[in-house]
Structures are given as C-alpha cells and as structure tokens.
Amino acid sequence: MKYELILEQLKIMGFEPILVDDELYKFAYKDMTLLLRNDNDNERFLSISIPFFYEFTGENKMTCYETVNTVNLLVRYVKLTIHDEHVSAVFEHRLSDNEDLEELLESMIHALSTSLSVFLKKMEGEKIPYLDYNPEEDDDETDD
C-alpha cells in the first residue's frame, strides 16, 4: 500500500502530516507529536510512534521499568521501549490489501494515546481502576 494513501487518510481525518525527512512524517494529536515512518523497503509495514515522551532518572528508574512492563502487558499492539533514559511508544502493523485505513489509524492513535496516559498516571502514582483493582479493598460489609 502506498504511503500517499495513508497520508491522504490522515488529512481526511483532520491531521496535518509534515515531512521531516525522506522516511518520516510527524503530526499532532492532542498534546502529542506522533511520527509516521515510511519504510521504503517494505510498503506493507506501518509504524506510528510517540518518541521520547518521558525522561527518567536514576531515582525512578526501577519504577519506570516496571511501568513500561505493565503497560506492555496491558495494551495490545503497542510496545513501550527504553532508549538511554527515555521512553517511547510504537504501534507497528502489517498492512493487508483492503485495509480500512480510517479504522486502522484511529485504532493505532487511540492505543498509543491510551498507553501514554496509563504510563504517565502510573508514574505519578495514580491508581488505574481496571489495573489496580484489589478485591480485598472492595468490602461491602459494614460494621454496625
């Protein structure tokens, strides 16, 4: 599938992809900058990422690694990766012939946004209801 179709679909969806270099486009969603990688060697490979969205320190290094692992287990298709002291998110997909690009791109962007949100909330110590549910804390019995 030609990347011109993907770029056109992003424009139809209201995004404004900007060419960064020969194989890279950037576009904005909410407060995020997303990158679309054009793999000239493989037209069927689609990759959208949120690069270097979090920088961690030695103090929170283990928490960061644990949170990356948790999000990777929780959100399908998105991979959080660590490069040096930065966390990035990527969604990679192999395109088929009759792909519904609007549905696919919406799913990819939503999954990336969700991963980022869950990661940041967990790093700030917030509880995620569906993730941090503890049945022992859900005691309906009251002492009268």
Please identify what each model-predicted range represents.
Residues 51-90, 144:
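Short, internal acidic amphipathic alpha-helical interface segments
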Residues 18-20, 37-41, 83:
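Short beta-strand micro-motifs enriched in acidic
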Residues 124-144:
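Short, highly charged C-terminal tails/helix-capping segments
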Residues 30-60:
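Long, continuous compositionally biased terminal/linker segments
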Residues 79-115:
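A mid-sequence interfacial segment
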Residues 24-25, 43-46, 87:
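Hydrophobic residues embedded in beta-strands of well-ordered beta-sheets
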Residues 1-35:
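Charge-rich, low-complexity N-terminal segments
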Residues 65-75, 101-127:
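Ampiphathic alpha-helical segments that act as solvent-exposed interaction surfaces
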